[in-house]
Amino acid sequence: KTTVFNCLTGFYKPTGGTILLRDQHLEGLPGQQIARMGVVRTFQHVRLFREMTVIENLLVAQHQQLKTGLFSGLLKTPSFRRAQSEALDRAATWLERIGLLEHANRQASNLAYGDQRRLEIARCMVTQPEILMLDEPAAGLNPKETKELDELIAELRNHHNTTILLIEHDMKLVMGISDRIYVVNQGTPLANGTPEQIRN
């Protein structure tokens, strides 16, 4: 399952077949180009810039999208300052949405595990993706954190026009938020359909 995510995001090049997004081939493209096209992901194990602050994690995620170059950055041109201000506003907005605004200047490694998971999702969302891939986001979360994750995923899907691809073993979470489910075991597809079809 994770191998599929790795192929979709450019970490692996598939040995056969094609991957299309809006009729454009993704296979073989570098990950940063795929991310600029609106396809981003989280990982099974939290991947944050642990020594950076919470807000710095969200700012660095937006660098690939800034429309400013080295020259404008060195001279701090009006367009550079505007882009930086917009990135900071977007970061603050997402920190507020995930309940971490008060921890903006805290080192990311000092957050509780559930907060680190939410920060990783916010880091993806500041890039304004069309497709967000979550690789076992509920792993290691307690029931309260899993419920908060469920609510966050529903908000992303319903209010931010983001398609969510989810690899998850928590079947209550999967059944509660999914429109469509694909069941795969050891790389072999077993079933696919709506939650109701899978349940029956």
What are these regions (language model features)?
Residues 2-200:
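Glycine-rich phosphate-binding loops of nucleotide-dependent enzymes
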